[in-house]
Amino acid sequence: MSDALGWVFTTPVSPGDTIDWLPTVNSRNPPHNEDFSWGEVSYSDIVPCFARGTHILTPGGDVLVENLRVGSRVETLDHGPQTVRWIGSAKRSARGACAPVRIRAGALENDRDLWVSQQHRMVLRGAKAELMFGEHEVFVPAKSLVNDCSVRIIEGGAVEYFHILFDNHEIIYAEGAMAESLHLGKQSFDALSYASRQEIKMLFPELDRAGTQLPQTARQVLRNYEVQALLHAV
């Protein structure tokens, strides 16, 4: 029998909610995962989001993320202009796992400071990535880039997060940096509120079918220890 780990909620879970939980693992041994830890789980630590005020590149130029609408066209790295299928947002206290990551201008080829949720995956690219992981471009969670200098977690006040969904998982341009759109992986999809899941299922009815394969990520996703190895490679 294979190991299994998951969560079952008896009430809807919304962005910013936290859950204190005790683990039950179907195994004599704990999960071997560098990123795994017992304790508090937060929606915003699973679902990738852009903070209000983020400029997103469209065919007509930069548009604030809060001004995008279903039907808006957004530039993507792989497939050119793509249509926004769904947008979600939520206001939360900027503390703990809900506190945003601030990426200073220039740190990731971004023209201005970029604010994203901690698990939002950014693109790192170059010869080192290709040598170490076989791909010129890879995804890394924003929080794995934190260096207490150009990339920091900023606590205090409130933050409004937005997530953008396309037909496929895409790489888009946020403040000039390459970042992911919302990926309908099992964890991120299950972490959305019930109402949001129902809206998305209306757009993608195949998600209700048993055995449906969820879409792959647009690039390989690195674990934290892999990100650190890449960042410190000589």
Which functions belong to the PLM regions below?
Residues E66-R73:
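Structural motif
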